[in-house]
C-alpha cells in the first residue's frame, strides 16, 4: 500500500535535501513547491511553507532519514550554524589547521573518497605557488600534477569507501550523510594521531550537513573529534587545507575510477547523467546484474533507469 508522510522542516534542511536528491530531481514542480524528486518507491516534494511530503512504498523510511535533527525550530538551526563552537574564527585562513573534504558522492560509478590534510601556516604561500584551489576548478591532469607534489609536502590521511562496502552500509540504514560523517571523523582522527605531538590550531570540515546532525551521526563512535572543530560551506575558499584535501580526494577518486574501468573492461563515465544509465545497462549485459554492486552506488535512481533500458 502506498503511504504519504509530511514533515515540517526549514529552508536549510530543504536545501540539504535538494542537494542529496539532485540526481533524482523531476523537471516538474507543483505550485508553491521548491523541488520534486523521485527515488525508487518514493516521491519527495518540498514546499516553500517548509513542508516536505514523502509518497510511496518507502515514504516512511525516506522521511525517517530527515526527521532526526531536521524538524527543529529556526532558532535551533541558527545556533548550530552560528555557534562559536562551529563557525571558523575570522583569522582561520592564516592558522595551522587540518582540513577535510570528500569526493565521489554524486557519482553513480566509483567509490567515495575522503581526505584530511594538515597545513602549517608557514606552508600556505607554497601551496598557493603549487596552484592549490578547489578541485572542482581543476581538470584531472591538473589534479594529478598538483596532487603528486602535495603528497610530499603535507601530512594527510586518505580513506576510500569502495562500492561493495558502501552498498552494504547503506542497506543497513546508513544514509550518505552518515557515511560521509564517519569517514571525515576517521580521516581526521587518523591524521591527528599521525601528527602527535604536534597539535593543530583547529580542524575545518567542508560542511555537508548541520554540525549537530554531523555529531548525531557519530553518536556510537568511540573516538569523535570535537575540540576546535569548525564547519564551513565552500571550505576550500576559507582555508587551503580544505582545498588541498579536495585535490587529494579527487586524485584518489580518479585513480580508483580508472582501476574500476579496467575491471569493467570498458570506459565508465563520471556523474549521474543519461550516459551513466547507458553504461550501467551495458555493464549488466556484459558481467551480469549480480556484479553491479562492485561498481555503482545502488540507491541512485540510475540503477532503476539502467534496468529499464534493458527491457
Swiss-Prot record:
Residues 95-311 form the RNase H type-2 domain. It is found in: Cytoplasm. Keywords: Cytoplasm, Endonuclease, Hydrolase, Magnesium, Metal-binding, Nuclease. A divalent metal cation binds at residues 101-102, 206. Its cofactor is Mn(2+); Mg(2+). InterPro entries: RNase_HII/HIII (IPR001352), RNase_HII/HIII_dom (IPR024567), RNase_HIII (IPR004641), RNase_HIII_N (IPR024568), RNaseH-like_sf (IPR012337), RNaseH_sf (IPR036397), TBP_dom_sf (IPR012295). It catalyses: Endonucleolytic cleavage to 5'-phosphomonoester. One of its GO terms (biological process) is mismatch repair. It is an enzyme of class 3 (hydrolase). GO terms for molecular function: magnesium ion binding; RNA binding; RNA-DNA hybrid ribonuclease activity. The keyword Plastid does not apply. Endonuclease that specifically degrades the RNA of RNA-DNA hybrids. GO terms for cellular component: cytoplasm; ribonuclease H2 complex. Manganese or magnesium. Binds 1 divalent metal ion per monomer in the absence of substrate. May bind a second metal ion after substrate binding. HAMAP family: RNase_HIII. It comes from the Bacteria. This is Ribonuclease HIII. Its EC number is 3.1.26.4. It holds the Pfam family RNase_HII. It comes from Bacillus cereus (strain ZK / E33L). Belongs to the RNase HII family. RnhC subfamily.
Amino acid at each position: 500500500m502506498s503511504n504519504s508522510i509530511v514533515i515540517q522542516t526549514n529552508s536549510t534542511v530543504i536545501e540539504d535535501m535538494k542537494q542529496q536528491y539532485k540526481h533524482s530531481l523531476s523537471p516538474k514542480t507543483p505550485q508553491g513547491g521548491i523541488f520534486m524528486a523521485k527515488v525508487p518507491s518514493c516521491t519527495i516534494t518540498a514546499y516553500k511553507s517548509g513542508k516536505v511530503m514523502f509518497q510511496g512504498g518507502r515514504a516512511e523510511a525516506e522521511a525517517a532519514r530527515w526527521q532526526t535533527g531536521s524538524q527543529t525550530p529556526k532558532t535551533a538551526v541558527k545556533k548550530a550554524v552560528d555557534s562559536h563552537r562551529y563557525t571558523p574564527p575570522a583569522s582561520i585562513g592564516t592558522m595551522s589547521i587540518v582540513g577535510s573534504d570528500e569526493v565521489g558522492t554524486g557519482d553513480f560509478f566509483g567509490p567515495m573518497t575522503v581526505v584530511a590534510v594538515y597545513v602549517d601556516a608557514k606552508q600556505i604561500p607554497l601551496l598557493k605557488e603549487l596552484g592549490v584551489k578547489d578541485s572542482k576548478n581543476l581538470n584531472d591532469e591538473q589534479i594529478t600534477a598538483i596532487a603528486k607534489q602535495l603528497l610530499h609536502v603535507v601530512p594527510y590521511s586518505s580513506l576510500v569507501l569502495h562500492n561493495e562496502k558502501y552498498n552494504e552500509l547503506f542497506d543497513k540504514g546508513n544514509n550518505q550523510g552518515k557515511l560521509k560523517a564517519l569517514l571525515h571523523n576517521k580521516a581526521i582522527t587518523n591524521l591527528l594521531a599521525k601528527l602527535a605531538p604536534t597539535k593543530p590550531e583547529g580542524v575545518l570540515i567542508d560542511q555537508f550537513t548541520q554540525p549537530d546532525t554531523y555529531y548525531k551521526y557519530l553518536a556510537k563512535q568511540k573516538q569523535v573529534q570535537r575540540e576546535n572543530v569548525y564547519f564551513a560551506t565552500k571550505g576550500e575558499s576559507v582555508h587551503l587545507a580544505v582545498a588541498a584535501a579536495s585535490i587529494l580526494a579527487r586524485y584518489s577518486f580518479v585513480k580508483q575510477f580508472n582501476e574500476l574501468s579496467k575491471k569493467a573492461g570498458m570506459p565508465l563515465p563520471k556523474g549521474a547523467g543519461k550516459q551513466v544509465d547507458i553504461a550501467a545497462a551495458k555493464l549488466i549485459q556484459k558481467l551480469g546484474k549480480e556484479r553491479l554492486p562492485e561498481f555503482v552506488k545502488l540507491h541512485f535512481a540510475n540503477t532503476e533507469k539502467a534496468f529499464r533500458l534493458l527491457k
